[in-house]
Amino acid sequence: MLEADLVNNINHYLEMKGIRYSNELRMGIGISDITLNFGANRRLKPLDDYFLVSILAYVNKKRKVTFFDIQEMFLLGLEKVKQYVFTLANLGLVVIKNTLVKIVKNIFSVNLGTTISIEAKLKDWKGACLQAQRYLCFSDYSYVALPSETIKNVDLSIFQESGIGLLSIKGKNIEEILPAKESVSCDYILKYISTSKVIEKNVDVEKRHLRANVFTSYILT
């Protein structure tokens, strides 16, 4: 078995359960094999640039700012600031009048649901656990997925201390060996970006009926 086969088995499980997911989500602090989401608004505005979302959050907080304010806050050149601001304006999120930037639409009250990331490995559970911890910056929960025959080699205390959950994969079935703990370091902006990427990946997918699954306890009601 290859790691790609393990990931494909997990993908199949998620599809059969009607769960939205994305593979190899690039977040700058690691690439999660699988990121899934429950409960986020399907009309979430897709924004995948950290500075873009950060600038929007800044304008939203201040209600109106100047190009200079943004330059000073984010230490960016004027042309770069204009590029970001005009992108936000084209999306209908801000309006520009001379050098003044005003918020038009607050997207930060939107429901982001629950985001879970998974690192899949065949044997290297220690490395996988370390990698999964990085995902807690943009996920509510993080798991390591291993083939069922590898589980016996794992020191569960390391997972318990780090808050990383553990999944056993056998064929296309998933069993939760250890539940994950909720992240205390999840950054809202990073979560917005990761969640919007999952939503964007599934925008053309017909809404599926969500079935009971190994992650059911995390589904928002």
Where in this protein do the model-derived segments appear?
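Acidic-basic catalytic patches of nuclease active cores, encompassing PD-(D/E)XK
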Residues: 1-38, 47-100, 221
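Non-catalytic C-terminal interaction segments of nucleic acid-processing enzymes
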Residues: 12, 18, 26-28, 39-54, ...
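Amphipathic coiled-coil/heptad-repeat helices and related helical stalk/stem segments
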Residues: 81, 103, 128, 151-152
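Accessory beta->alpha helical hairpin/"wing" motif in late/C-terminal subdomains of nucleic-acid enzymes
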Residues: 99-110
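Nucleic-acid nuclease catalytic cores
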Residues: 124-125, 139-173
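Catalytic core segments in nucleotide and nucleic-acid processing enzymes
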Residues: 132
